[in-house]
Each structure stands twice: as structure tokens, then as C-alpha cells.
């Protein structure tokens, strides 16, 4: 966006914008908000800009527990997505809410990685997590690195930068099939392929965010949902569900 385009979008003038850039004029609270909105500045950074200019933050930052209506909405979506996995993550990819789908996916994951806050990235790629059972590990690691790098570029954050460096340092799984590329010219998206004791399951993932957040925490939450990528996965999940229900029935 050019200076002229920004000034027009913010209903200001290039002269005033130039004066703000050179320090010959002090920004008002209103003009900071207008410029920030035109530049799609995240709410957290908008608050930081206001504080730097001597103003109070415009957007509250509540805990997830305080966001009652949003939490109910997320819980509803997560539970409706059963029997497939779905979870809500914060800006550092820590899981804040989840459903109880397919515990078989997490068999063999270390107790350390299961302790709260559970980090979704570590859970999937760490050598002590699901990493050794991700059959297209290289693909999924590359996808994750791309997502984290994009996140850092849009909103630099020490926590995300550290997580990115950690993921890049993970050793590739030693199992040969974990290095296997899955080339498919007809494929529209990259699934995650996971080896389980029931067979290989493949999932496509989607990320959903709130459209009009006015709270910093809510603006940084995302719902990640996994969908079966093939009929084999649909059938395996059904088998998992039947076995789990049978186990519960025997235990009761």
C-alpha cells in the first residue's frame, strides 16, 4: 500500500501522514485506530501502538474462561465434530479446548507432551510425540514450518520464533516409511497420514477463526478440525469407536 493509498483509506491526507512519519505531528487515538485498521494490524499490536503513543489500550484481553459466549460456541463446534478430532488453539498453538475424539492417535506420546498446556505442534511433530508415526513427516513438517514462518512475518513473536526453531531442529524419524513422499497430482490439499494399530488414517485439516473479534484473546484463537481424507479412514474410525464403546460397556 502506498502512502497515498493509506491516507485515502484512512480518510486522512498525505501531508498529515508525512508529518506523523517524521515526528512533526503527534498522532491522535482516532488516527492510530484508522491507520491500524487499514493496515490490518492485529489487535494485540494495535494496543501496543496506542500504549506507545500514550493512550490506553482499545481492546481487552480476557482469559478463555471469561469469554463465556465464545467458549460455548467453540464447545458446540468441537462436540458436533465428533468422532473426528477438533481443538481450539491460542497464538502459540497451545490447546485451550478440545473434544475427546480418537484417543488412539495419541498412543505412545510421552507424559511430558501430554501435560498442560499441550502444544499441538509439539504433540504432532516431536520425536516423543506422534512424530515417529506420521508417515508423511517431511511434508507435514514443511507445512508446519510454512505456517509458523507466515505467522512470524505477520506478527513477530518470540514464542513462535522459538517454536519454529525447535521444529526445524527436530530429527527426521528413523523409520523409512516416515520419509516416504506421497505424490498425487490430483490431490487438492496435503493430508496428515498417521500410523495406528488399526491401520493408516489420513486427515485433512481446516482452521477457523472468529470473524469480528474485539478481544485480543478471541482474535488469536483458532479452531482446528480434522476430516477424514479417504474412505479407509472413515472405516477405521468406525472400528475405533466400536471397540471403545465395547470397552466402556464391559467396564460398566
What is each of the regions a protein language model found here?
Residues 29-33, 37-68:
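Short amphipathic recognition helices of helix-turn-helix/homeodomain-type DNA-binding modules
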Residues 10-26, 36:
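Recognition helix of helix-turn-helix/homeodomain-like DNA-binding domains
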Residues 1-7:
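Short basic helix-loop element that most often maps to the first helix and adjoining turn
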Residues 5, 16, 45:
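Residues in the helix-turn-helix
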Residues 3, 14, 29-32:
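Helix-turn-helix DNA-binding elements, focusing on the entry/boundary residues of the two helices
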Residues 72-85, 89, 96-251:
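Hydrophobic protein-protein interaction segments
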